Amino acid sequence: MKLRFLGAVGTVTGSCSWLQDPARGWNFLVDCGMHQDEPDGAPGAPKDWPFDPATLQFVALTHAHLDHCGLLPALYRDGFRGPVRCTPETAELARLVLGDAARLPGSGITQADVDRILWKPFREDQPFGQPRPVDQDLFLRTYRSGHIPGAVSMEVLWGAPGVGQRNIVFSGDVGPGGEDAEVAPMLRFPWNPRSACFAVLESTYGGTVRTPQERDPALRLARLHALVAGIVETGGTLLLPAFAVGRTQDLMFDLHAVVAADPLRLRDLRIVLDAPLARRVQGVVARAMQRVDVMRDKVRPLWLGKQVFRQLGLDDTEPDDIQAALDIIAMTLTGVRGDGSQPIARGNALAQQWRALTEPPTKAAPDRGRAPQGPTVIVCGSADGCGGAAASWLQILLRDARHVTATTGYTAPHSVMGRVATLADLPLKERRRHPGRIEWSDGRTLPIRDIGATVTRLRGYSAHADQADLLDWVFLCRQGGDGVVAPTLFVQHGGDRERVALRAAILQRAAETGQRISVVLPQRADEWVSLEGQPATPPA
């Protein structure tokens, strides 16, 4: 078996890894993502495939973000006819995400391209961590990665099961936190993989160590409450541009929690979800939270986190409490409970005061031409602010001092929200001196001197692991062995500064603990790496 990294080499986006064993007839990809927001553009255009797409057997997909699945339509358009193997949740979400991308001008794909994709989700009646055969002596095994619902780390195993079988595990995008130290509002903790011969690790925040304050869910909620309470006082609007998959659902859950914790003070607050893709995603995520993993000796929620039960004072071993948690998730994401509209009668005061707050999708779309009347939170699509609802709202709300705009995660420096975020630390009187302007691709502009709204960064919502989390992924593998996830580790999916910092941290931890590990930073997309050089690690 040999491996070639076709994307995310020294960049954050464009994940695509090509695995091949000509002697055994194996030829497949792990992920097939597009480049996004990279300064050097997207070198991996469909015409540049280094293979004939018709010769590929399958694509193993880690999750449904465009930087991992965005080139699938082009791959099928250019001749690929095999299946995409992934979790059922990833298949559902990717259909929506790719369909939405096909509607964007200049995307280069059409709905017909998306409809060609042959999704082959993993069977739900098999335990999640069980190897799944895809060919003679070729298997895939998944581990929940804690990034978004459906997201997994993907292990490839080849050779007859037992001693001598070889394997490589691709991290996909790893989420923050761990068991009983969850950071995300709803999603269950990431799994550590079993030890392998080789591993590939993302490094989006490989050089970042978040403070305890940034990781503390209680402080995250307190920061959100302060913003919401502020606009209730001013009668203004809080604008939260957010990613449609993952980030929007987390924000909606926390907004409902904030109101449930302070119902009298916030009783007049209006919450608007102005994001067509996110509205379609909400139901998929609500259904995903119902899924359980039935193993030999236990049954556990697959995607619904333990932290939800702790926050709501519910017992995750009691069927009625489990149903109460699922009802709260359904109210939050879809506005409808599964068993009617009676208040929740179990759990703590927060659970019992929880109400569905978002307006139903059947209601007329909000008027983006003027600011809402009364205190309002708008969660909108287009997290970069460059188009869609965010672009319209920004041009209305940024001018008025009553309003607040907050970033909810990473924004590319050259994007609209990236430029807006730079104003967070610039006092209003200094903005008045600023000669620059915010520009949109349709020609609309807004002078920075005219921006009177408060601009802030709402921290705590990143769905990516930081350096400490990534070190845990490397050194806290589920299986014994040599104490590291693999003796050879490839670090990609990150800028070079992040990759170099992560490599240094890994080598330092290895030296301190007496572990041996080789950390490789792939540099070129045209080089093959042999996967036959390490002694086989028998996968258990």
Residue positions per predicted region:
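Hard-cation-handling environments
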Residues: 223-419, 429-430, 483, 492
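Generic long, charged, amphipathic alpha-helical segments
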Residues: 432-474
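Short, surface-exposed amphipathic charged segments that create phosphate/polyanion-binding patches used
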Residues: 134-142, 284-292, 470-474, 531-540
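Conserved phosphate-binding/catalytic loops in two-lobed NTP-binding clefts
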Residues: 512-528
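A short acidic, amphipathic alpha-helical/loop segment
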Residues: 71-75, 254, 389-396, 473, ...
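Conserved acidic residues
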Residues: 57, 196-197, 376, 403, ...
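His/Asp/Glu-rich metal-coordinating catalytic cores
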Residues: 1-60, 65, 69, 74-250, ...
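A short, acidic, amphipathic alpha-helical segment used as a generic capping/interface helix at domain edges
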Residues: 389-397, 462-483
